[in-house]
Amino acid sequence: MSPPTRLAVVATVLACAGALFTTGTASAGTLTGDFYREADTPAARWVAANPDDSRTAAIRDRIANQPASHWLSNFNLATIEAEVSSYVGAAATAGKLPVLTLYGIPNRDCGGASAGGAPDLAAYQNWVNLIARGLAGRSTVIILEPDSIALLTCLSANEIAARNQALHTAARTLRAAGGKVYLDAGHSSWNSASEQANRLAAAGIADADGFYSNVSNFNSTANEAAFGRNLIAALNSRGITGKRQVIDTSRNGGAAGDWCGDDNTDRRIGQAPTTATGDADIDAYIWVKPPGEADGCRYAAGSFQPDLAFSLAGSPSSPPEESGSCAATYQTTSAWNGGFQGQVTVTAGSAAIAGWRVTWTLTGGQSIGQVWGGRATTSGTTVTVANESWNGALRPGATAQFGFGATGPVSTPAVTCVSA
């Protein structure tokens, strides 16, 4: 699960802490507001340099125009404070929430495709201190060291203890500087919730705000949310309460499976970044791994690859439209001359639902054919798909999907969902 390796500075910042962090509501966790979208990213630079490429529109609209985490992965003590301060200032001016991912721990990725980081833990602490100075007390969401807790196979018992101490110190240092800090929980197909809870406890999650999961991976949001609930319960049983989850949804809108996405064309971008999760245990869905950046299998880790970005973009995915206690997101999964195939993901809100109905309007020349995973009716240009008996009841945050074949021009319908 190698995250991107590139020079990147991200601080999730808002000028006023009260505007960013709330005490939590029934519809979301402890974050509010919109995420900061940096203008100068690898995806945006590629789009600007390739205006006539056939892939440009899709990459621009579905990836470059979305906010994604900005990584601090280049260990440079001379420039890091100014870099962070500049970014935090830009975010505060925009009134948005940028996301800072720190990726500089020694022995990161256990020497794999994203190897690098600080030469030792003392230097690492100096680096963290400079980042904290750059934050200067401004509210900041921080994704602290992907893989650092879930991936320990290359470390001895003494090295694990030293890393835990370093992460604990980093969390406290960054929180004192205004940080909202989340620690590494791996993902739902890796360590068990019980094992990961033990590791998080040892790494000082009691002094952090929560944990993140699915970074650089492809597991569904529903699976990650279920894993998060189990992990929160495991932490609670150890006397560590009040922790919440962040889920990386940058690449979990298609196939799951092996962590490396450099050669897999079945992967898609997932839920757009948002703090409106509809789940009090989940603070945000964030694109931690910027879509289009390689894992290190076929291409250099962290390098932007337009073919990967275009494959992940697939077809436009409209943001969830909340109505009642469910939301729906549309994605075109394939298209051909005269027709296309679409897929809709239904997500329950903060309360369980017994059923759902999704509605959208056909454009000129479109008609719906076969539908699977739901029961369709059409009235004029309005299509309504209701759940089957086996996929209508959803727990809070759980998802169901249906698909359909259609004739006519491809479009991106504004799908809406109501609970039945």
What are these regions (language model features)?
Residues S114-R138, P146-G178, A193-A197:
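Active-site cleft segment of glycoside hydrolase catalytic domains centered on the general acid/base Glu
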Residues A352-S379:
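Short acidic, flexible loop segments centered on an aromatic residue
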Residues A327, P396, Q401-A420:
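Terminal connector regions
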Residues E322-G338, G349:
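Low-complexity, acidic Ser/Thr/Pro/Gly-rich terminal tails and inter-domain linkers that flank the onset
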Residues T30-G134, R138, P290-Q305, A309-L312, ...:
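N-terminal carbohydrate-binding/catalytic regions of secreted carbohydrate-active enzymes
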Residues W336-Q343, A400-Q401:
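Short, solvent-exposed loop/turn segments enriched in Ser/Thr/Gly
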